[in-house]
Amino acid sequence: MTGDFAFVDELVSGIRWDAKYATWDNFTGKPVDGYLANRIVGTKALCAALGRAQERAEDLGFGLLLWDGYRPQRAVDCFLRWSQQPEDGRTKARHYPNIGRAEMFDRGYVAARSGHSRGATVDLTLYHLTTGELAAMGGGHDLMDPISHHDARDVPRAEAANRRHLRSIMAACGFASYACEWWHYTLKEEPHPDTYFDFPIA
């Protein structure tokens, strides 16, 4: 691991994670290049901001669960290769029910150069401290559909409220939201705004 990067769980007490791209449970249907361990990595600045967000979430009865942080460029390249393969239907219903693979890039759900590769972006959700269950958000991680947008109008009231909780927590701790994905947040003051890293997560 390079320079000012760290495993988030080593710096943020109590945070939970499930690194989706290190598992078979993601839109490609298999572990992604560069994810050799089920851990979340980020810059130390990201970790500090997540620590503040975790404390704010706890005040509201929630905890944070991370799905992704730093993403090696080789993983993004893997996404691009996957998008060019024939459709096999294995993950389509769950992750991109109304578009084709190539459209993920056109519609802004996946990018050839990802902010994740700069080390200051996270995919995350809330869970209830009392039960440990994930908060309902009206759609899962990497559901590439308008229902995942922040301005989606068909999200049930309780789920929409949970999205607002997450957004307010993250905004208060220096993060910017992404219009197309309720789970995606980037630290406004990125340490490496123009650098895309490629070291593996191991």
Curated annotation (Swiss-Prot):
The record marks R71 as: Transition state stabilizer. Binds 1 zinc ion per subunit. Keywords: Antibiotic resistance, Cell wall biogenesis/degradation, Dipeptidase, Hydrolase, Metal-binding, Metalloprotease, Protease, Zinc. GO terms for molecular function: D-Ala-D-Ala dipeptidase activity; metallopeptidase activity; zinc ion binding. The active site is at E181. Its EC number is 3.4.13.22. Catalyzes hydrolysis of the D-alanyl-D-alanine dipeptide. May play a role in immunity or defense against glycopeptide antibiotics (perhaps at a moderate level) in the soil environment. Might confer vancomycin resistance to S.coelicolor. It is an enzyme of class 3 (hydrolase). Zn(2+) binds at H116, D123, H184. It comes from the Bacteria. Pfam families: Peptidase_M15. The gene is vanX. Its cofactor is Zn(2+). This is D-alanyl-D-alanine dipeptidase. Belongs to the peptidase M15D family. One of its GO terms (biological process) is response to antibiotic. InterPro entries: A_A_dipeptidase (IPR000755), Hedgehog_sig/DD-Pept_Zn-bd_sf (IPR009045).
